[in-house]
Amino acid sequence: MMRRLLLMLPFVVFLGLAFFLYRGLSLDPSARESALIGQAFPAFTLPTLEDPDTEVDESLLRGQISLVNVWASWCPTCKEEMPQLLALSERGIQMVGINYKDARDLGRQFLEEFGKPFEVNIFDPAGDLGFEIGVYGVPETFLVDADGIVRYKHVGYITPAQVDEVMMEVEKWR
């Protein structure tokens, strides 16, 4: 009897691992919940990417709806996302970029090459602000309402098909 149980143990372990693997692979990574939803965007004071002597803070995200996109020059999907961000910037939304864990010169070159959808680019070379807002990886996009409250988070790059979905979220909070 004991021998039979020992022979079945690897099979049971295999089934358990297979279940958890299947469950993990079936989850949508862009649907991750964020503890920041419904909370004020965290306080920060950081320089802009363009000018190290110009600092901005969280007040930048008050008074109008903003899309805050976390990006980096070393991120291949950030390049793919740029046309969609440019399209969103043409729809009258304040676009704010957070250049995450990057070198200033590389971030500037990236924008020269792929476009400048952002009114302001926050330079976060150490990733401290990214940590505060719970960034898992880049790109990630946050919708911040006119009161500075985070209302929506999109994990991963925004595809052409998702531009209208993002705009529907924007319209909910206008």
Where are these regions (language model features)?
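Thiol/disulfide oxidoreductase modules built on the thioredoxin-like
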Residues: 112-117, 124-171
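C-type cytochrome heme c attachment motif
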Residues: 73-80, 140
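Structural microenvironment flanking redox-active thiols in thiol-disulfide oxidoreductases
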Residues: 79-115, 125-131
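A short beta-strand-turn-helix
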Residues: 44-67
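Hydrophobic beta-strand core positions in alpha/beta domains
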Residues: 67-69, 97, 143
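Short pre-active-site segment immediately N-terminal to redox-active cysteine/selenocysteine motifs
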Residues: 64-66, 70-74, 137
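N-terminal targeting signals for export/organelle localization
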Residues: 1-47, 174
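Short gly/ser/thr-rich secondary-structure transition/capping motifs
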Residues: 25-27, 47-54, 76, 121-124
